Regions:
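Helix-breaking motifs and short loop linkers at transmembrane-helix boundaries and internal kinks
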Residues: 57, 78-84, 112, 264, ...
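Helix-loop-helix hairpin linking two adjacent transmembrane segments in secondary transporters
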Residues: 123-167
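Cytoplasmic helix-loop-helix junction between adjacent transmembrane helices
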Residues: 88-125
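Extracellular/periplasmic helix-loop-helix junction of adjacent transmembrane segments
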Residues: 12-44, 237
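C-terminal transmembrane helical hairpin of 12-TM major facilitator-type secondary transporters
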Residues: 260-310
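Conserved MFS/SLC helix-loop-helix module at the cytosolic interface between two early adjacent transmembrane helices
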Residues: 44-80
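Paired small-residue
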Residues: 68, 72, 83-91, 290-298
Length: 402
């Protein structure tokens, strides 16, 4: 997850440098298109990962995904032309898109009852840590070196992470049980069962929530430095805001995870969306710098931290035999929002709006996400109570879902 966070923020941190790189002469709209190639790869990786997970296990799938991300980073670092840079970004997306659908159900199954959100939040902190590291690298090392160095650091980080993951990442207990009992590995039908009654409405709801969350995360992380530049902040301060945004996602995300374990998922998810919207709009004001820093941290809690809560909400709303399929479908379809985020952000900035309206436009997905979460109500819990028992086990899903 740290590697995923590094990639997510690396592109946003290097966006101003890409626009200023004279040999390529890139427009704002074209950089937005480049930013969308990674989410396209994520969409494909998320939808296909179930087949690899069923065949090779969640641990092995995660290790392969880390290697793919690292290879894509090296391709970006060595790219002599924008087209090859775009290919590298797409390859990175394939790997990143496969990581969480393989790891998410594993985390959920290993976490003790009543601590599902907390354990997921702790793992999700890796995304914020990686994002903060990417922003720090951009802030301290890129001056005078160009954007290629950022991606070289990311590729090296992936290579260093592989042996650590190989040594310490456990396999799913469910997968071990199936193999040791000589039972056939699940054939992936869970991916299609989640698209049939009584789960169809729940799946559509989660796809929409994930789509709005990813649109917000990728849009803000890609364009926050440029947004702050339009508000007359220098580039170095603008990159500092990325560090604070991901700090807020770490600290605030854990606080919201603890709340979700006590009160259920729906309220904290709604609160995160609303906090994100309010903070993004507040960033457009000329606030004293310490106050602005606090606002950006709050924005990170809401805009970036919400996805970890949604991931657990998905996992706890389906039986164990459908859990990986549900996460893969919801996050895969939700990646459409990740594709749209950088592109829409590029269009907004290219439209030449007043700086305040740029920020308001970026806050709209957060408002829609809060409204959708409130309107969804207890659909997940209702569908869970109507569902048939699991074909292999009568295992209940965990915890409250409203």
């Amino acid at each position: 997850m740290t590697l995923e966070g590094f990639d997510l923020v690396a592109f946003g941190a290097t966006t101003p440098l890409l626009l200023d790189y004279r040999p390529w002469h890139l427009s704002v709209a074209f950089v937005g298109l480049l930013g969308s190639l990674t989410p396209i790869g994520m969409l494909i990786g998320s939808l296909l990962v179930g087949q690899f997970t069923d065949r090779f296990g969640r641990r092995r799938t995660t290790l392969i995904s880390i290697g793919v991300v690292s290879a894509g980073m090296f391709a970006c670092a060595a790219a002599p032309v924008p087209a090859l840079f775009g290919v590298g970004r797409f390859v990175v997306g394939l790997g990143v898109g496969a990581i969480y659908p393989a790891m998410g159900p594993l985390i959920f199954e290993l976490a003790p009852a009543g601590r599902k959100n907390l354990f997921s939040g702790i793992v999700q902190c890796g995304t914020a840590v990686g994002g903060s590291f990417a922003a720090l690298v951009a802030n301290t090392l890129l001056t005078g070196h160009g954007f290629h160095l950022e991606y070289l650091v990311g590729g090296i980080a992936g290579l260093l992470l592989l042996p650590l993951a190989f040594a310490w990442l456990p396999e799913s207990t469910e997968y071990h049980r199936a193999v040791s009992a000589s039972a056939p590995v699940p054939d992936g039908r869970g991916r299609w069962l989640v698209l049939k009654p009584p789960y169809l409405g729940t799946t559509v709801m989660f796809c929409a929530m994930a789509g709005l969350s990813f649109l917000l995360i990728f849009g803000v992380n890609t364009w926050l430095p440029k947004l702050m530049q339009t508000a007359d902040y220098p580039l170095q301060d603008s990159q500092t805001f990325l560090v604070l945004l991901n700090l807020g996602a770490t600290v605030g995300g854990l606080a919201m995870a603890l709340l979700a374990d006590r009160a259920g998922s729906r309220g904290p998810i709604t609160a995160c969306f609303l906090l994100g919207a309010a903070a993004i709009i507040a960033m457009s004001a000329r606030l004293p710098l310490p106050v602005l820093y606090a606002v950006v941290i709050i924005g990170g809690c809401g805009a970036v931290g919400v996805q970890g809560l949604i991931n657990v909400y998905i996992s706890r709303s389906y039986p164990v035999t459908m859990r990986a399929g549900a996460v893969g479908v919801a996050l895969g379809v939700g990646r459409l929002g990740a594709i749209a985020g950088p592109t829409l952000g590029g269009w907004i900035l290219a439209a030449g709006l007043q700086p305040r309206w740029n920020f308001v436009s970026f806050a709209v997905p957060a408002v829609l996400g809060a409204a959708l979460t409130l309107a969804a109500g207890g659909r997940a819990l209702q569908n869970q109570s109507r569902s048939a028992p699991s074909p292999r086990a009568k295992e209940p899903t965990a915890g409250p879902t409203q």
